[in-house]
């Protein structure tokens, strides 16, 4: 069997098949469905305790101990500007660090775990920082890019934050082979900062959902490659779905072809089951135009397997095979 690029061959709807079950949300969407932005967190400073003492008649009685915490004026938020992710492409994030107090902070470091999660005994990251992508703003004015260090996590260093100011980092991360792709999957990304001397760590998270859609490819083969006049020939059309959403009848995907030379007495099968003319396909022995009926073509979703050692995810596409056999 040989594969050829087909002339006069189209798959109507295949390259336009996008089934979005979780369309991107806007940066400013604060609805309950938008889980990409978490409530801002403030730094905890020192915890302090206090106890009163009562003395009378040579006796000493201690009160209960009270506990309270000092809060700094720092606030950290993280937002995924890109609403969904797929096997290829980038996710855009924004981290905002706001100083609402009267104390200036210098040389702060903001870290990003790039969505790290555990697979077996290994920790893998489904995202890779896009080199040179970070843009740094202080009070809305672009600044020189911060120092970027990539180790166990992504770190932006040397950030100074005067009293009453707001720092914003916008950067991109590329989806890699460890990103989960099955329907319903998410990447949970955590940012943190040291807050300067004497201040505890603050974290903020952003969650991005996988894009749920079909992703179709199509190929065609002919057998035999050399056929005599009035001989029989079989065309095999293979449709693969690399996406996490199946093609179902209501998606109305159509395969069409023009057989030249024209075939006669054709037999058509889909995944080994014979299709009836009129309900499964239409064909003209005058023009050679062949078309499947809308709804006859279905393709299962891909399946995904993750290596427990490396964390790399392999994709097994869903496949449907259409054959057309006739006489030349």
Task: Describe the role of every protein-language-model region.
Residues 7, 18-21:
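Intrinsically disordered, low-complexity segments enriched in serine/threonine/proline/glycine
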Residues 10-16:
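Cationic, amphipathic, low-complexity segments that mediate targeting or membrane/lipid association
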Residues 22, 27-328:
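Exported/extracytosolic protein signature
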């Amino acid at each position: 069997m040989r594969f050829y690029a087909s002339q006069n061959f189209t798959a109507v709807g295949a390259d336009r098949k996008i089934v979005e079950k979780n369309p991107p949300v806007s940066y400013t969407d604060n609805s309950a469905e938008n889980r990409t932005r978490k409530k801002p967190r403030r730094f905890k400073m020192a915890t302090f305790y206090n106890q009163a003492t009562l003395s009378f008649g040579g006796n000493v009685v201690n009160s209960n101990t009270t506990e309270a915490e000092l809060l700094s004026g720092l606030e950290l938020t993280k937002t995924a500007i890109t609403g969904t992710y797929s096997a290829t492409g980038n996710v855009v994030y924004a981290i905002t660090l706001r100083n609402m107090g009267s104390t200036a902070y210098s040389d702060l470091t903001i870290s990003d775990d790039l969505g790290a999660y555990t697979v077996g005994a290994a920790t893998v990251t489904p995202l890779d920082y896009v080199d040179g992508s970070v843009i740094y703003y202080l009070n809305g004015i672009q600044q020189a890019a911060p120092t970027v260090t990539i180790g166990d996590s992504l770190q932006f260093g040397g950030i100074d934050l005067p009293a009453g100011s707001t720092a914003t980092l916008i950067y991109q991360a590329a989806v890699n082979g460890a990103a989960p792709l099955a329907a319903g999957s998410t990447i949970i990304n955590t940012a943190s900062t040291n807050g300067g001397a004497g201040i505890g760590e603050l974290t903020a998270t952003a969650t991005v959902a996988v894009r749920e859609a079909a992703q179709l490819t199509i190929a065609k083969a002919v057998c035999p490659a050399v056929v005599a006049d009035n001989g029989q020939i079989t065309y095999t059309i293979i449709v693969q779905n690399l996406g996490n959403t199946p093609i179902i009848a209501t998606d109305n995907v159509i395969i069409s072809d023009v057989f030249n030379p024209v075939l006669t007495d054709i037999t058509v099968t889909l995944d080994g089951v014979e299709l009836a003319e009129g309900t499964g396909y239409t064909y003209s022995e005058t023009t050679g135009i062949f078309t499947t009926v809308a709804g006859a073509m279905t393709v299962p979703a891909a399946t995904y397997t993750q290596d427990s050692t490396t964390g790399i995810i392999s994709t097994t596409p869903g496949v449907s095979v259409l054959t057309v056999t006739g006489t030349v």
